Structure formats: structure tokens, C-alpha cells
Amino acid sequence: MQSQDYKKRLKLQIIIILSIAVMSCGVPNVPTALSSLLERESIRVGTVYGAGTFYNGAEGPQGFEYELLAGFADYLGVTLDLYPFYSYEVMLEQLEEGNLDIVATGDAVTPALKRRFAYGPAYQRVEQELVFQAGATRPRDLAELDSPIIAVAGSSQAHLLSNLFKRLSEEEDEAVQTQLITTEDSDSEELLQQVANGDIAYTVADSNRLALQRRRYPNLAVARTLNENMPMAWALPLQQDDSVKAALIEYFGTVHQSGWFTVLEDKYFGHIRQFDYVDSRAFNYAAESTLTQYKSLFQKYAGDLDWRLLAAMSYQESHWNSDAISRTGVRGLMMLTLATASDWNVDDRTDPEQSIRGGSRYFASLLNRIPARISEPDRTWMAMASYNIGMGHLEDARILTEQQGGNPDLWVDVKRRLPQLRQKKYYRTTRYGYARGDEALQYVENIRRYYDSLVWLDEQGKI
């Protein structure tokens, strides 16, 4: 992620914004909400724990919302004081009472919440999905559900369902058969897990959270979409002036224009939008069974790499089948060619230890060939693409990226050009010619999904 480079260019812009605001203000010396938090030198933000919002990972605080918030604090030149809450209502009351400056939970804006709070600009749009366990009877209509829908109290989903049930009761001659039950004992991710386990029949989740959890629980299925294209935005106190909102508009405009928002969105969601039920079930089963045979070897030869990333690559290559062979003759756990095996002293490509050792060292050499100015995780994704199609074709894609006005050092830009390598009007201009770049793109995105799943399974003690 190249957030630091972008942030350095953004930090001074707030000074210009404030200067304009001060000069245009007709009443001097009246503090605004923005000037108050700048004087305090901190911004107080309420949030909730979650894979897409905020959590403490192995490398410190992480999460899509967290990185956006940290960027905004850096943009203002203040400290981010982040307060995770276990209750939406308590958190929202703290915002109303002026004890928080912003609430950022990765939730959609509902009409009920909009009457209660002001909001910054919409930065994403999501669908609200009615979720049930795959294999159960798919409900045809919300009014005919035979079990309650469970939602987190105070969440966007609870507000949405409350409004839907009220409308159904007014429109239907007969009473709605099911009911909404809200809880503060479980968060939205736990409710999805409970649906997957069969402990509850239904919940509602936004498309972002569902996409993150379906890799972990492939038997989560969508019964129907309850609401499409709902905006996501950060909540602000309703009665305060618009100074913080104006700063948010400037901030999001700048990070969109700079490309940093696109990079961040790709980091958390770019590889999980597509879901394959069969593949996810097969992978999770293999991770909890077959992987145990080779885990120690991946750990032994990973070197500076995360062993789980190396294992994810191997699954994409061979499904952890040491005897695997492709139609082009590559073989083994890491699917090495004869030439690559020779270069890295692999005598028997079907020998698990030799294959993992050779594959890891070959991949490390590709990483070292990626220009040093390219930061992580872009370096890794580009090296991974070159493992699949070769460094020459990767460079062709990077050149096409630059020619088309993209950034050749950003994976999110380069991956859009990889499929062009099999289109004649593009590959005829490249040095290395035709390549199945679309397959290289899918190769990398699959590994990213497998890696995320392995990290989670490892944290759960399942591998």
C-alpha cells in the first residue's frame, strides 16, 4: 500500500481549506466543530470491531474503515482516538451527546438514521441481503418466513427490517408471519456464523460483510436482496455546523482523485467480489485435512515470506497434490517447469520438499526483480503474476498501464491491463507478445482469497 506517499501530499491541503473558511467567515472568533478538534489535536471516532472495519491484526490495527479514518486524521494533522463499541445505541448516544466527532462502522445510511444524524459523503454503496443456510428451503417472500430474522440492535439492518416489517403490516391483509429479533450479544459477523452453523435461520448483512464471511462459511446463501445501492457514509452530530462535513468532502475527493481509495478498496474487497461455493468448500476441507502433510515444509522454506501465502500459491497450482501434472508438463506441488526445476536444483518435481523449496526460492527471486520503489502488497501480487505468466509479460502489462495513464507501480492499475495481453490490438505492440493475462489475474486473485482463508483458519486453530 502506498498510503504514506499519498498522505504526505494531502496533509498540507487542510491548511488551505481552513484559510479559505476563515477568510469567508462573517463572524470572527466563533469556533467551528472542525477548529475545535484541530485545537484539541485529536479526532474522536466510534466504531465496531469487524474484518472490514477495525481489528488488531498481527501487524497492528487494520481494517478498511480504520485505514480511511487514519488517513483522515493524518490529513487533518491530528491524532486518531478510536473507540470500539459493543453497542450501536450507546455509541450513537455518545455521538449525539458530543463525546464523539464521527461514527464510522461500515454501515449503510437508512432513512431513520438520516433523520437522527448528519452524514459525510457516500464513499461506497452496498446491497442488503437476506441470508440463510445453503441447503435449506429458499424463502420466496419476506412475509412468509417461518423463523425470526436476527439483527444487531441499532444497526442499519435492524432499522431497515423494522421499516420493512412496518410497511408489510400496513400493506398485507394478514399479519406478517415472522418477526425481527435484535441482539447486542452478537455482532453481524457472529450472526452470519450462526446462520452457517444452523443456529439461527436468517439474518441480514450488507454485501461487503457477506463477501468477507462467505470465504470462511461457504454455505451462506442469499435468499433475496432487500435493498440495493444503499450509501455508506460516516455519521456526524445532527446539530453541529458543516465544517467537519466539508473537510470530509474534501478528503474523500482528494483520495479518490489520487487513486489511494481505489488501492485501499482493492486491498480489502478487490479479490472477494466473486464467490464460488464449490471451490470455497473444497478449499476449506483441504486446508483442514491435506495441508497438514505439508505445513512444516511450507514453514521451513518460506524464508521472509508468510508460509500461508506460499501454501495458498501451492493450492492454486496443484490443490496440494504432489503428483499433479498440467497439460503443458509442469509438475508437483508448486508446478515447476523442467527449466525452473533445473535452475533451482530440483531433481524430482514430485518430491514435496524439493518442490516447495524450489518454488519458494524461485518466487523469492521474482520478488527481488520487482522494482524496489514498488511497495507491498503490490510487489507480492506482481511477483505472483510473473510466477504465472513470466516477468516479461508482466513488464508488458506495466508498460501498457503507463501508456494508458495508469500507475505501473500499483497492482490495482496493472491488473486491469493484464487481460489486454491476449487482445491483438494490444499484444502486437508489446515486446513479448501474446499472453493469457486474464488467467494470471484470476491466478493472483484466487491466491489472495486462499491466503485470507488460511490466515483466518490459522487464527482459529484449525490448521
Curated annotation (Swiss-Prot):
InterPro entries: Lysozyme-like_dom_sf (IPR023346), MltF (IPR023703), Solute-binding_3/MltF_N (IPR001638), Transglycosylase_SLT_dom_1 (IPR008258). It is a peripheral membrane protein. It comes from the Bacteria. Residues 1-33 form the signal peptide. Its EC number is 4.2.2.n1. It catalyses: Exolytic cleavage of the (1->4)-beta-glycosidic linkage between N-acetylmuramic acid (MurNAc) and N-acetylglucosamine (GlcNAc) residues in peptidoglycan, from either the reducing or the non-reducing ends of the peptidoglycan chains, with concomitant formation of a 1,6-anhydrobond in the MurNAc residue. Residues 34-272 are annotated as: Non-LT domain. It is an enzyme of class 4 (lyase). GO terms for molecular function: peptidoglycan lytic transglycosylase activity. The keyword Cell wall biogenesis/degradation applies. The active site is at E317. Pfam families: SBP_bac_3 (PF00497), SLT (PF01464). The keyword Isomerase does not apply. One of its GO terms (biological process) is peptidoglycan catabolic process. Keywords: Cell outer membrane, Cell wall biogenesis/degradation, Lyase, Membrane, Signal. GO terms for cellular component: cell outer membrane. In the N-terminal section; belongs to the bacterial solute-binding protein 3 family. In the C-terminal section; belongs to the transglycosylase Slt family. The N-terminal domain does not have lytic activity and probably modulates enzymatic activity. The C-terminal domain is the catalytic active domain. Murein-degrading enzyme that degrades murein glycan strands and insoluble, high-molecular weight murein sacculi, with the concomitant formation of a 1,6-anhydromuramoyl product. Lytic transglycosylases (LTs) play an integral role in the metabolism of the peptidoglycan (PG) sacculus. Their lytic action creates space within the PG sacculus to allow for its expansion as well as for the insertion of various structures such as secretion systems and flagella. This is Membrane-bound lytic murein transglycosylase F.
